[in-house]
Structures are given as C-alpha cells and as structure tokens.
Amino acid sequence: MRVNIEEKSYDGKRKILKNIKLDIPKHQTTLIIGTSGAGKSTLIKCLIRQTKFKGTIIDEGYDHKAMLEKIAYISQHPTLNKNETVEESIYWTARLNFLRQSKANLLEKTKKCINDAGLNYVCKQPVKALSGGQMQRVAIAKELIRDKEILIADEIDTGLDCGVARSLCNMLNHIAHKEKKTVIVISHNLINIELYDNVVVLVKDSNKTGRIAYHGSPYQMKTFFQVHDYVYILMKLNSEDEGGENLADFYIDQYERSI
C-alpha cells in the first residue's frame, strides 16, 4: 500500500497531517505509534476513507475507492452480539458475506478462523462470558473470515495486560505471515514494539501538525532516536534540546532527509 497524504486539514485552516508518505509492505505487520494529538486516529480515517484529504492512497494499481473492498477494520470497541457463542458469531459473519457457499464450506471456514484466532477452547462459550482480550480475538476472527487482504486494527490492545496484548501481537503476526495479510495496527503501547515488522512514529511539529519522524524496523529505532529503551522515544519527542529546539522537528527533518 502506498500512502501519500500531502495534507489533511479541517475547515481548510488547522493542519492535522502533512507530508505523510508511506510504503506499507505486503504480508507484514506495521505498527503506528505517536505522541498525543499527532493524528493517529485521523490517519486511520484517511486509510479507511472516512475523511477527505489532499493526496492519494493506492494498492497494486487499485485506487483508494476500489481498495476499500480489500480492507477489514477493527475498532477499539467492536460491536458483538454477546448472546451468541463464539462459533455462532463467526459463522453468521461468514454466512452474511458468502451467501452462495454451502453450509459445510462455511463451517469449515469458521473452524479455520477459530483456530487461527486461538479460540478453540472457548468456541462454544457465549461471547458475554469472554475476557476483553478474547472478545478482541473474536472481532479479529469475524473480519478475518471475510477474507480481506488488508487488516487495520485501531487500539485493540487498550486496557489489556501485557501478556494478553503480547498474545494478540503474536496472532496478528501469524495472520500476516501465514495467512498472507497486510496488517496495520494503531497503538500507544510500546511494550511489544519489537514484535512488529515495521514501525511508523507520528509526532506533532512546532506548528502542531502531525508528521512522520520514523518509518522502519523496530530494531533500528533505539539508534535513530539515541535511547536505550523504547519507552523513552515518545518522551523524547515531546521535549526540547539544550538550545530550545523542538526535538520532534529535528527528527522529522532527519527522517525526511533519509527518504
């Protein structure tokens, strides 16, 4: 997916995003993190065409409008029928999306998605009996069964403990690498950052506009930002150097010079 958002503003005045240029690799996981107010949610809205912007988003020759047919989106608070069992919830999603397929085929798809999402041990339980992490797995499975090529997950690890969030990351990696999906994740959680193939860091420049300060491997981030731990990256991008310069501006310039 090639993203080129020249500018996103509201009322033609306040710029929210500027110069967002990304090549998001196929069949890999890409994590998008950022400082508060840097435009992560707005970027997602651009990707799923919920807001207008100046620029283009294309994928393998498909324009943005046509590309929407290839995208599955999972929100932080997915809508689930909590009275259904896990198996029923996923099966009926398949039934609604593949009307001409036989029941046997749909049940086979359901079984595979339950397995891929790590839900075998709770498949007969009602959704309302699940934990928050398990409900997110059901939401992912319901999108996975629709067989879209691109999966976008928005803050799905919010409120989950570290172990559960890590297991979700591992599942998303399985979906990307084994099921050949392109997975994009928005998160504020830096603990599992090394599990992703690629990381994008959004920051606010001195004009309060969201820009890219980094895009690359998580293993090169510490060197790029000159920190010994990932947790210090966003703290550093919210500070100034000894001369009073906005460090976010410095790293935006460093990144844009490198591309």
Describe the predicted segments one by one.
Residues 1-6, 10-13, 35, 202, ...:
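Topological signature of polytopic alpha-helical transporters
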Residues 48:
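Helix-to-loop junction immediately C-terminal to a conserved catalytic motif
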Residues 77, 82-99, 109:
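Q-loop/switch helix immediately C-terminal to the Walker
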Residues 105-122:
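Conserved ABC ATPase "signature" region
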Residues 126-130:
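Conserved ABC ATPase signature
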Residues 140, 168:
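Hydrophobic anchor residue at the start of the ABC signature
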Residues 145-149:
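A short, proline-enriched helix->beta-strand linker immediately N-terminal to the Walker B motif
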Residues 151-154:
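Catalytic Walker B motif of ABC-type/P-loop ATPase nucleotide-binding domains
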